Structure formats: C-alpha cells, structure tokens
Amino acid sequence: MDAGDRVFEARYYGKCAFGAHGQGDCIQKLESEDCLYLNIWVNTDDKTEKKPVMVWIHGGSYIMGSGSQTSYNGANLVQKQSDIILVTINYRLNMYGFMDFSSVPGGEKFGTAPCNGLLDQATALRWVHENIAAFGGDPGNVTIFGQSAGGGSVSILPVLKQANKYFQKVIAQSGSTGLAFPVNSETAQGKTKALIEYTGCKNMDEIMALSEEDLQKAYVEAVSKFTSCPYYGTEVLPEAPIELYKKGYAKGITIMAGSTADEARLFMGEGVDLTLEEQKLFAQRAVGDAVPYVKEEDKKYYEEFRRVCRFQEPGLIETELIDDLMFRVPMLQQLDVQSAFDKTFCYYWSYPSSNADMGAAHSVELLFVFDLRGVGTSSVFNGTNISDEIFNATQQMWTNFARCGNPSTDEIEWKPYSVDDQNVMVIAGPGDIRMEKGLLAEQYKAVLPLLKYYQFMDKFFTPGYLADILAAREQGSQLRW
C-alpha cells in the first residue's frame, strides 16, 4: 500500500506468503513475496472504549498457512465476545522466512534471514501498537496467541527486543520455545546447501537474481525436505530462547500455555487418515529409528519414560513420547522458567474429536477458540464433539485472559501454574473442566533430559513409513515392525 492520507478500500484479503496453500483452507489464493498483510475484526455494535486486542499468529510448521484461513475467521469470536478486537497476520514462510546464508559469499549482509519470519511478526505487532486505537483498541492491552508454529512464535517473541514492547500477554497453544533450532544444525545448514546445489548459485548476488518461479521450484524440489523454523545463535536470536527466558528477557509478560492429549495423531498420516492401529505402527517405527540418536548415558531416561508412561501398550507409548518431546514437555519447561518472573497458566486439552482414531489431536481446540462449527477444515474438526458448554467456557477463558491476564470465569477458577504448585486446567469434556496438580509429572521428569534431541524430531515423520503402511492396507495384510 502506498504511503499517504488517502482512504484505502480494504475489501479483499491481502496476498499470502509463498507456501501458504499447503494448509488447504486459505481464502486468498494469490501467493507473493508481497504478503505482509493483516486482518482486523471489530464488533462495531459494541461501544466499549479501549477494547482488548488479540493478535493471532498462524501455525503451519513455518512452511504454510496464512492469517486469511477459514480456520481463523474471527466473525464468530467478536460476535460473541463483542468487546474483543481480533487481528490475524501473515509472515514470510519456509526459506523466505527462515534461512541461514552465513556460509554463502555475500551472506553476511543477510544476518536476519534465519529469523525474518519472526521479524515480520514483530513488524505487524508494531503496526498494531501504532494504529489499533483508530479501530477502538487499547495498544496497552495486547495479547498475542497462536497454535503449533504460531504457538512457537508467540513463545519466542517475548525474548525478542524488536517485539516484546508491543504486547503484555501470551497464549501459546501446542507450541513452545522448543520450536527453534541451532543455526549450526544439520537442518539449518542442509537447507542452504540444498538451495545452492539445486540452483548452482555461487553467491548471494546470484541467489537474489533468481526469479520467484526459480526459487519456488528450488524449494519444492530440494529445500522442502528440511524443517523450517527460527534459528538461534544468530543476529536476531543470539541464544536458545529458553536460555533467554532464564535471563529474564520475558519478565513482565504473563503466559498461558498448553497442549492436547493426542497431538501427534494429526501428523502421522501426512494428510492421510490412518486408523489407530496404523498410527501405533507408525509411532513404533519412528521412535525405534530415532533411539540410536540417543547417547548411551541418556537411554536410562527413555527407559524410565516407558515405565511411567500413562499408556503401557506398544505404539501408544511411542505416540505419547512424540507428544511429550514435541509439545508438552518443552511447554512446561518454558512455564517453569517464566513462573519465576511473572504469572503463568497451564492447560491440558483432552476433550476429543468424535473421530475416535484422532482423539484430542493437534489443532482440535481451534474449533472452540474461534467457534468454527460448520467449517470442517480437517479430520480433526469433522465430527468433533459439539458441546455448547465447552464452546462457551473455552472462549470465555481465552478472552478473559486477554482482558485482564486471568483466564478464570464466574464458574471456573483457574489457578496459576508454578514449579511448586504445577496447577493444570484439564479440559476433558462437558461437566469435566477441572484443576489438577502435577498432571503426568513423572513423564515430565523422564522426558526433560531428552529435550536435547528435539532437533531430530523431523526424523519421526519419514515418508517411507506411510508408504509401507498404505501398501499393507491396500494388500489387506498385517504389517509388523
């Protein structure tokens, strides 16, 4: 948009980042490097002055998604919670948003590239801070919230000096500081090497001269096999985010965070709905192939996890380990550290989809946060148990936190989380929303020393596993590993 005082008729969603449509339900179909747009939902019938502002940062593994997905339509939320302003944003994805060029001649000029996507988010937050009052919002009462990669983003932004002055509260859904990898990792350097080898470019000038079409082809054919995420040990993130939390970089920010009971079930089929038995086979092979990366002195923690796991059935044990390593344990570690500086709140979502094979899978709570009844964007949402009680309680808790930093409602007292108290709000179903102390605490203790292996998690989802499972399904045979 050109600078100036003219009125801009914002009747259509702005373009999405390259890769956005991997998520599948983006309303805007155009992708471009010109993608830094945001959307604002305001209930104009509500005359509340200085409305609380909630800024949504989308997920999608840092490779897909946008703020204009059907899943994040804010109309129902601001209709029911009329004093809330909702903002959803775009940011650069995959190699456009998260790429290290330090090993490429001329790459020293691109020191922010490993975290450009985070800086895009920071820029959006600055825009909200400077302009939201014109829409009736309070720039001094801003909550950032996100899920999956969005949950990782809102967990990292509190330690980012370019961002943390623009918000006061965080809701991290199924994402944590663990969603940042070291810049010298195989994942980070492998992406750069793949781009160089595929394009034949010898320096940054040649890379910058590539057309959008050439870059997209290189991404699809070579770079996409590597995980995308923010990288630390860089100009933007000098240390691992959890280490910056320990130093008090996020002091003054109140955080609410949680995970679902069956996170990994969404990922195992890679877009194909697997039965529970097929998921268990997938998890057994994935964890079995990852165990060799664990040092001998750390294998005792893996054995301890198997002993204390809430499941004792092969396949479910491994699925739970993936859930804990990727989501629940790094989230709890983050809350443990931050609770020394500010109030923190924790939840555990176990209310399942009526799709029994999916359970309470990754993303299931989005239906209730945004009130997506009838949207049906994935197997997690389709057929999800519909409960007005859970819809109303979820939205009230989330928006109360945005209003005042406390998610309690008139009916539900939500106690803060701390290392000593370990209070967790369990959202299990109608008539079963309750506080628990020390939920799955033994699992947490067993997995915490294994978080150093988090960066190998992408090895848990090797496409060959799925191909073998589907071949066995086609042949009607039993697959054993």
What is the role of each PLM region?
Residues 25-204, 244-268, 339:
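Serine-hydrolase-like catalytic core of hydrolytic proteins
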Residues 123-131, 395-408:
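K/E-rich alpha-helical interaction surfaces of small helical-bundle regulatory domains
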Residues 169, 212-388, 397, 404, ...:
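Substrate-gating cap/lid region and adjacent catalytic-acid/histidine neighborhood
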Residues 72, 116, 120-123, 148-149, ...:
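Generic recognition of stable, solvent-exposed alpha-helical segments in well-folded globular domains
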Residues 1-118, 139, 376-394, 405-413, ...:
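Non-catalytic accessory segments of hydrolases
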Residues 92-94, 145-149, 348-356, 413-419:
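Short, solvent-exposed turn/loop segments enriched in Gly/Ser/Thr/Pro and often Arg
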Residues 140-142, 202-210, 315, 346-348, ...:
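Surface-exposed patches in mature extracellular/periplasmic domains of secreted proteins
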Residues 193-221:
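Accessory cap/linker subdomain of secreted extracellular hydrolases
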